[in-house]
Amino acid sequence: MVTQSVEDSSRSGPRRTIVGDLLKPLNSEYGKVAPGWGTTPFMGVAMALFAIFLSIILEIYNSSVLLDGISVS
């Protein structure tokens, strides 16, 4: 037969790199969930600010009445 077996030396495990060593502490908390609400309020604030940003862009692009009370010079 022509089959070959893979040598054990090629299975030495994962290589260590500088980037991997720098990023490993960021992955140490993987799978753990903070008790309570965590960062949910911050996500809500970020979503609200993003919605305001999108409505401003829509106002500039479409000249709609969504922000009719705000004057644009």
From Swiss-Prot:
One cellular component (GO) term of this entry: chloroplast thylakoid membrane
Positions of transmembrane segments: 41-61
Main location: plastid
Record PTM Phosphothreonine, positions in chain: 3
InterPro entries linked to this entry: PSII_PsbH, PSII_PsbH_sf
Record-level Gene Ontology MF annotations: phosphate ion binding
Highest taxon of source: Eukaryota
GO biological process, alphabetically ordered: photosynthesis; protein stabilization
Key words, A-Z: Chloroplast, Membrane, Phosphoprotein, Photosynthesis, Photosystem II, Plastid, Thylakoid, Transmembrane, Transmembrane helix
Topology of this chain in the membrane: Single-pass membrane protein
Subcellular location: Plastid, Chloroplast thylakoid membrane
PTM summary: Phosphorylation is a light-dependent reaction catalyzed by a membrane-bound kinase; phosphorylation occurs on Thr residue(s) in the N-terminus of the protein.
Similarity annotation: Belongs to the PsbH family.
Annotated function: One of the components of the core complex of photosystem II (PSII), required for its stability and/or assembly. PSII is a light-driven water:plastoquinone oxidoreductase that uses light energy to abstract electrons from H(2)O, generating O(2) and a proton gradient subsequently used for ATP formation. It consists of a core antenna complex that captures photons, and an electron transfer chain that converts photonic excitation into a charge separation.
Quaternary structure (record): PSII is composed of 1 copy each of membrane proteins PsbA, PsbB, PsbC, PsbD, PsbE, PsbF, PsbH, PsbI, PsbJ, PsbK, PsbL, PsbM, PsbT, PsbX, PsbY, PsbZ, Psb30/Ycf12, at least 3 peripheral proteins of the oxygen-evolving complex and a large number of cofactors. It forms dimeric complexes.
Name of the protein in its database record: Photosystem II reaction center protein H
Lineage start: Eukaryota, Viridiplantae, Streptophyta, Embryophyta, Tracheophyta
Gene: psbH
